[in-house]
Amino acid sequence: MKEFDTIAAVATPVGEGGISIIRISGDKSLDIVSSIFKGKNDRTLDDIKPYSMRYGFIIEKESKEMIDEVLVSYMKGPRSFTAEDTLEINCHGGVIPTKKILKELIKSGARLAEPGEFTKRAFLNGRIDLSQAEAVIDIIRSKTDLSMKSALKQAEGTLSKEINSIRNRMIKIIAHIEATVDYPEDDLEEITGQKIKVDLKEIINKIDNLISASEEGKILREGLNTVIVGKPNVGKSSLLNALINENKAIVTEIPGTTRDVIEEYINIDGIPIKIVDTAGIRETEDVVEKIGVEKSKEKIDEADLVIFMLDLSRKIDEEDIEIMDFIKNKKYIVLLNKLDLNKDLNEENHFIKELDSKYIIKTSVKNNSGLNELKECIKNLFFSGEIKSDELIVTNARHQEALIRSRESCIQAIETLSDEISIDLASIDIRNAWKYLGEITGDTLDENIIDKIFSEFCLGK
C-alpha cells in the first residue's frame, strides 16, 4: 500500500542557508540512508542508537563520490512524529547538495513525499488527530505571537479533549436510549426523555462556548481583512506606511499615485491585521487607474473592515457620498484626516450626521495623531475585551461549521423529545451531532476531505 512506502522530502525552504534538512520516514528508512552513508573511519549506521546523531558523508552509490558532509539523526517508531522509523539528514544549506542527496534517497528506494504526507502519516498512525494536524500548518502560518500560542494549544490536543469529552457524553445518551427501547417493560421512556433533554441542553451550552469565540478565532488564524478606501490623495498610503512603520506605498501630492492594491500584515496586540491600501475611488478616464478602482471595489466586498478616509481640509463631495453608500453595509471606521491643517469639516453636514459617531476618528496621519485610537477601535469592533492566550479558541472555519451543525442536531433531538415522538428517533439526531463533532478530530470525516486538507500542507511537513 502507498501508505507504507518509505517517503523522503526536503523539510527546509529551498535556497541558500546554513543547513538543509532532508526527512525520510518508513520501515526502510534506516536501510536506505545506511546504503548511502559513510561515517568517520568507515563507520556505518548499523549500530546507531535511537534519538542520537552521527557525523559522516552522503556518497553517490554509482560513482562512490562524496556528495556532502552531514549529520544524521534517528528517531525510532513509534516514538517519532510519524510513529514510524524517521531519519533526518542535516547537510549544507544549498540547492545542489540538497537535491543530490534527495535524488540518491529516491534511487535507493524511497518515494518523494506528497505535500503534508509526514503529518498525514502521524494522523493515520494515531499519533495525532486531524485538529492537531491542522494546527501544525497554523503554527507555520501564524502572523502574531497570540495566533501562534492559539495554534500550539490546538496542537497539544486541548480542542480534541474538549470535543472527545462531549462526544463521549453523547454516546452514553445514545446507549441509554437504546437500552430503554430494548427493555420497554421497564416503562422508563418518559423519565429518560426528560433526563436526555437536560443532558442535551448542557451539551449545547458547551458547544455554544466553543462557537462564541470562533469568529475571533478565525481572525487570529487568517487575519482581519482591512481595506483602506477613499478618494485619491486623502492619505491612504500615508496611513498604510504609518501602520507598518515602513515606506511601502509611494506618497505624493499627485492624485491617483496608487494604481494597484498593496497588502501588508500588522500586529495589534497579538491580532493579525491584513491592511490593504487601495487605489483612490473616483471617476477616471485613465485605463490603468480605472482597473485599480475596480480592484478597490472588489477588495471592499471581501473586507471584514473598511477604513474610510476623508480629508478635513476639503469639503465633502458626491464622490465621498458614493463611497460611503458603497460601504454602508460593511463594518467601517471613518478617519477625518489632515487635522494638522487646522481646517474643520462641517460636522453639521447631513452626510456626517448619518454616520455613527462611535466610528469617527479625527487624525493627522502625518503627525501620527489618532492612530492609537484607531487601533483601539479596531479591537473593540471585533473582540470583546482582551484575548487571553491560555483560553481555548476555535480558529478553524471547518471546525466552526461542524460545531454549528452538531448544535442544530442537538436542538432537533430536543424538539423530537418535546413532541413526544418515539424516543429512538431522537437518537438519530444525537448520532448525527456525534458524527459532526467527529469531523473535527477526523474520526468520522470522509477520506477525500482528509486528503484535501493535507494537500494544502507544504512538502516535507
Curated annotation (Swiss-Prot):
K(+) binds at residues 233, 252, 254, 257. Residues 223-383 form the TrmE-type G domain. Pfam families: MMR_HSR1, MnmE_helical, TrmE_N. Binds 1 potassium ion per subunit. The keyword Nucleotide-binding applies. It comes from the Bacteria. InterPro entries: G_TrmE, GTP-bd, GTP-bd_TrmE_N, GTPase_MnmE, MnmE_dom2, MnmE_helical, P-loop_NTPase, Small_GTP-bd. GO terms for cellular component: cytoplasm; cytosol. Its cofactor is K(+). GO terms for biological process: tRNA methylation; tRNA wobble uridine modification. Its EC number is 3.6.-.-. Belongs to the TRAFAC class TrmE-Era-EngA-EngB-Septin-like GTPase superfamily. TrmE GTPase family. Exhibits a very high intrinsic GTPase hydrolysis rate. Involved in the addition of a carboxymethylaminomethyl (cmnm) group at the wobble position (U34) of certain tRNAs, forming tRNA-cmnm(5)s(2)U34. NCBIfam families: mnmE_trmE_thdF, PRK05291.1-3, small_GTP. This is tRNA modification GTPase MnmE. The lineage of its organism: Bacteria, Bacillati, Bacillota, Clostridia, Eubacteriales. The gene is mnmE.
